[in-house]
């Protein structure tokens, strides 16, 4: 859901920027650019979190592969 929300925020920012530039409202254009930047940052943080989870799951999986009789915590969600 976060990915969709981030994309929507980025698109909304692009629209604001375009309207601001078309009407000569530099403040609105700046606000649109800021919205796009914020959406890009949120997306990057979300992607980084996903990569960390994937890495943790691989590490946990490698321990299970070595000794399946040892109990391990659930995979990171």
Swiss-Prot record:
InterPro entries according to UniProt: CsbD, YjbJ_sf
Residue numbers spanned by region Disordered: 1-77
Transmembrane segments: none
Annotated Basic and acidic residues bias: 30-56, 64-77
Protein family membership: Belongs to the UPF0337 (CsbD) family.
Entry protein name: UPF0337 protein CE0198
Species this chain originates from: Corynebacterium efficiens (strain DSM 44549 / YS-314 / AJ 12310 / JCM 11189 / NBRC 100395)
């Amino acid at each position: 859901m976060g990915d969709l929300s981030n994309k929507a925020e980025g698109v909304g920012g692009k629209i604001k920027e375009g309207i601001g530039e078309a009407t000569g409202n530099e403040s609105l254009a700046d606000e649109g650019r800021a919205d796009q930047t914020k959406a890009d940052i949120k997306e990057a943080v979300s992607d980084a979190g996903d990569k960390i989870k994937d890495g943790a799951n691989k590490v946990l999986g490698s321990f299970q592969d070595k000794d399946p009789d040892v109990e391990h915590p659930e995979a990171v969600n």
